[in-house]
């Protein structure tokens, strides 16, 4: 079945009953320690895929070379494996839609750019970074909406070079039409709308695609049927839907998840909150079972028992069995570490002595109390 056929077959009036096996993906960028949001999205992806006999794909979106951090891709593999969120396809395991790294797919994107340029749906922009900065500052000073002013649209390179603020390394921009569709049916948010976008860059001066082009092309070519992402991407959805329309391929269903927020209701940031780093939970001794349970509760209600009582402790398997998009909380919950500590304590107390000891060894080794493979005398000196 082709990518288009898979997408068309998976579209259904009932989002929780796809006609064909669904395909979902998580697509982190290797820009440092993996964000806890990667695990948050991945577990919802995986739950829906497993419930309906579909596939879960890991794609590495490494087109932002300025922010690329060596070794962070391996951290993605390691932390997702630690949580038990195993993918069916990805750079490390392969699959029918390889390659799964965007930097290895650069030849894939150019034909799509050429098509849009030839059809007049995109154009070259030679504006320098300084000229764009001045433009935005002027718009802000006049309290105007910020966005590209189309100075380059309809001009040849020679015509544009005669004007100030010229760069000989152009980008390619979408030509957003006046009648761009701004509404869609979201699996979580329901009927949703976003502001009109400006003429977004889809190909950078270095030849790398921007997120907006690459994500649409890759999701299409990998036959992704459901795109699960945070609500911060709602404003990008109209331009993505427009690209699907222009490229004449079916669009996937969108599910915009509630954001992970701190006590001040601000989005959790790795710059401000150590708990935004997925590796932090490993370092602090949280059990993966507890973290998955906690993340599920950030966007999904507890289990309601037959007697009406709520049960907040549940396994990933239980979460998968009862998963429905309609039950995802639109607003989300506060990222309360007290709740995680309580859950972690519960799961620790459920461990048998042998399992507890094996999980303690890495921490004891880090403190210099035992070797990486402790001997019986070393263990005998310990008192739990």
Predicted segments with their positions:
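Intrinsically disordered, low-complexity coil segments
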Residues: 13-20, 87-97, 158-165, 301-313, ...
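Short, histidine-centered active-site or binding-site loop motifs used for metal coordination
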Residues: 26-30, 60-62, 217, 221, ...
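Short capping/connector residues at structural and topological boundaries
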Residues: 31, 39, 65, 105, ...
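Alpha-helix initiation and N-capping motif
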Residues: 73, 106, 110, 129-132, ...
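Active-site cores that bind ATP or allylic diphosphates and position pyrophosphate for catalysis
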Residues: 118, 123-256, 261-268, 277
């Amino acid at each position: 079945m082709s990518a288009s056929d898979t997408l068309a077959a998976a579209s259904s009036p009932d989002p929780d009953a796809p006609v064909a096996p669904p395909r979902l993906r998580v697509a982190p960028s290797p820009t440092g320690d993996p964000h806890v949001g990667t695990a948050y999205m991945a577990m919802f992806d995986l739950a829906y895929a497993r419930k309906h006999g579909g596939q879960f794909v890991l794609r590495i979106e490494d087109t932002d070379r300025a922010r690329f951090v060596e070794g962070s891709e391996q951290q993605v593999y390691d932390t997702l494996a630690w949580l038990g969120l195993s993918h069916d396809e990805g750079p490390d395991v392969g699959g029918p839609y390889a390659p799964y790294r965007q930097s290895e797919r650069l030849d894939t994107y150019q034909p799509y750019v050429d098509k849009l340029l030839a059809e007049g749906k995109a154009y070259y922009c030679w504006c320098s970074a300084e000229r764009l900065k001045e433009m935005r500052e002027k718009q802000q000073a006049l309290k105007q909406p910020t966005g590209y002013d189309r100075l380059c649209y309809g001009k040849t390179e020679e015509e544009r070079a005669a004007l100030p603020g010229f760069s000989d390394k152009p980008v390619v921009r979408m030509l957003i039409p006046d009648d761009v569709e701004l509404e869609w049916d979201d699996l979580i948010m329901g009927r949703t709308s976003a502001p009109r976008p400006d003429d977004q860059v889809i190909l950078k001066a270095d030849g790398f695609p921007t997120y907006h082009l690459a994500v649409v092309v890759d999701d299409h070519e990998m036959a992704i049927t459901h795109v699960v992402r945070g609500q911060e991407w709602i404003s990008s959805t109209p331009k993505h839907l427009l690209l699907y329309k222009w490229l004449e391929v079916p669009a996937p269903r969108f599910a915009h998840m509630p954001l992970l927020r701190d006590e001040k209701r601000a989005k959790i940031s790795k710059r401000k909150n150590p708990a935004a780093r997925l590796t932090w939970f490993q370092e602090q001794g949280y059990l993966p079972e507890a973290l998955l349970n906690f993340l599920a509760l950030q966007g999904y209600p507890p289990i309601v028992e037959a007697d009406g009582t709520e049960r907040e402790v549940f396994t990933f398997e239980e979460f998968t069995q009862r998963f429905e998009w309609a039950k995802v909380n639109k607003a989300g919950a506060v990222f309360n570490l007290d709740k995680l500590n309580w859950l972690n304590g519960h799961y620790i107390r459920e461990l048998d002595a042998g399992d507890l000891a094996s999980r303690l060894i890495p921490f004891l080794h880090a403190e210099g109390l035992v070797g990486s493979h402790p001997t019986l005398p070393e263990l005998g000196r310990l008192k739990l």
